[in-house]
Design a protein with these regions (language model features):
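Active-site gating/metal-coordination segments in enzymes
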Residues: 63-64, 71-148
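An N-terminally biased module of ancient metal coordination in phosphate/nucleic-acid-related enzymes
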Residues: 1-70, 75-79
């Protein structure tokens, strides 16, 4: 991936899983965005095993990765998807000293979403929450986030 070894240990705070299982949930029209716009390597975009992900992390000295279970927009709207928490929980089991889970938040879910967040923390050992407010066309301090 790179010829230059990073000597500084890194914690990557927002990591999207690229496993085949996780990619099944993403809309198929994202290829151009990931590969052309943000220059994701084609091999990475096509999917990695957990072990392949750990190998890439080793290559650039990423010691820990906070894996997000994103909630991209409200379900039912075009382009929206939610990655089930269980998929991230399964990844954490592969290397719990390096993978940590962040539960995606959908502010339109209200108290049901709060209960899901609580379950992710208590049952799956997630360490926190993650949100993309722009996918909901809300500011981060919108009142819909208050229950969380």
């Amino acid at each position: 991936m790179t010829d230059k070894k990073n000597l500084i240990p890194v914690i990557d705070a927002v990591v999207n899983l690229q496993t085949a299982e996780a990619l099944e949930f993403r809309p198929s029209d994202r290829r151009e965005f990931y590969i052309e716009k943000i220059k994701v390597d084609t091999d990475v975009f096509e999917g990695l095993t957990h072990e392949g992900m750990l190998a890439l992390m080793d290559e650039v000295n990423i010691q820990k990765a906070f894996l997000i279970a994103p909630k991209i927009g409200q379900l039912g709207l075009q382009g929206s998807y939610h990655l089930p928490y269980e998929i991230v929980a399964d990844a954490i089991k592969v290397d719990p000293n390096r993978f940590y889970g962040l539960a995606g938040i959908d502010p339109t879910e209200g108290m049901e979403g709060v209960r899901s967040l609580e379950r992710a923390i208590k049952e799956f050992g997630f360490i926190g929450a993650h949100s993309y407010p722009h996918w909901f066309e809300l500011s981060p301090d919108d009142r819909k986030y208050y229950p969380f």
